[in-house]
């Protein structure tokens, strides 16, 4: 019997793959997402699916927005996926494919896919994905799966997420169609939106602080340049005066 990997094992693997330091504000985001992915990966009932992939990719992109240097985000995401035995390219490709599928489906088709026992016209692919989840008695629900479904709905019908009443009605239909806990999913998504808002506020404060620091640094550099210029002018003036004095003294000696 193989030994179940621990959170420590996964974190160690992650930091082996990604060796650059991570900004302290974002380190908690990365580690919390990594732990969540790890716990699912070692759960016997968990099965990877495109909605989960979309949830992972969306969470990472939304919470890591504003990370610097931007190039490090690629390494961080790849290392997270590698640490749990996953493939970053597969996550991104499956997430992108699901987004494209969402854009091809109308709001009516979405609703019918979650309500009907047969696929509605033009939505066979989506219906099959939903049906596979609904018929899985051991389906492992997760917050990341919920975020994936939420993102999918938003890509198909953005106004669904802007109107609280319509959003709740749609989530009721979705959870019923997937045989998932409605209240749990709604609470998870409420927390997701709340955390996003808090993160955006933190980033705004950070950007303001960086702007102030940048202005202070630019002012200091400008003042330093001005002082250097003044010193240069003063030196040149003194040199000219010395030359004139020497010339005058030479003339007197003559």
Curated annotation (Swiss-Prot):
Q: Which domain of life is it from?
A: Bacteria
Region annotated Disordered sits at 215-254
The disulfide bonds in this chain are none
GO cellular component, as recorded: plasma membrane-derived thylakoid photosystem II
List, as start-end ranges, the regions of compositional bias called Basic and acidic residues: 215-228
Taking the record's annotation, the residue ranges forming a coiled coil are 182-241
- Give GO terms for biological process: photosystem II assembly
UniProt key word Coiled coil: yes
Q: Which UniProt keywords apply?
A: Coiled coil
Q: Does the keyword Coiled coil apply?
A: yes
User: Its family?
Assistant: Belongs to the THF1 family.
The record's function comment reads: May be involved in photosynthetic membrane biogenesis.
Task: Write the protein's name.
Answer: Protein Thf1
UniProt gene name? thf1
């Amino acid at each position: 019997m193989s030994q179940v990997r621990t959170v420590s094992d996964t974190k160690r693997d992650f930091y082996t793959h990604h060796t650059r330091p991570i900004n302290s504000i974002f380190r908690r985001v990365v580690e919390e997402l990594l732990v969540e992915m790890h716990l699912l990966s070692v759960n016997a009932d968990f099965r990877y699916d495109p909605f989960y992939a979309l949830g992972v990719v969306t969470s990472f992109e939304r919470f890591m927005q504003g990370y610097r240097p931007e190039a490090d985000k690629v390494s961080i995401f790849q290392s997270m996926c590698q640490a749990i035995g996953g493939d970053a390219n597969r996550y991104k490709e499956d997430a992108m494919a699901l987004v494209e599928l969402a854009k091809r489906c109308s709001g009516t088709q979405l609703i019918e896919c979650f309500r009907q026992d047969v696929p509605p016209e033009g939505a066979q692919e989506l219906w099959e994905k939903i049906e596979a989840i609904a018929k899985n008695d051991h389906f492992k629900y997760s917050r990341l799966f919920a975020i994936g479904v939420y993102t999918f709905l938003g890509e198909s019908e953005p106004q669904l997420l802007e109107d609280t009443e319509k959003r709740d009605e749609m989530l009721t239909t979705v959870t019923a169609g997937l045989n998932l806990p409605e209240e749990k999913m709604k609470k998870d998504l409420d927390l997701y939106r709340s955390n996003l808002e808090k993160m955006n506020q933190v980033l705004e404060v950070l950007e303001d602080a960086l702007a102030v620091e940048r202005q202070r640094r630019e002012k200091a550099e400008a003042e330093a340049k001005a002082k250097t210029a003044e010193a240069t002018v003063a030196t040149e003036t003194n040199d000219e005066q010395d030359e004139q004095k020497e010339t005058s003294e030479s003339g007197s000696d003559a």
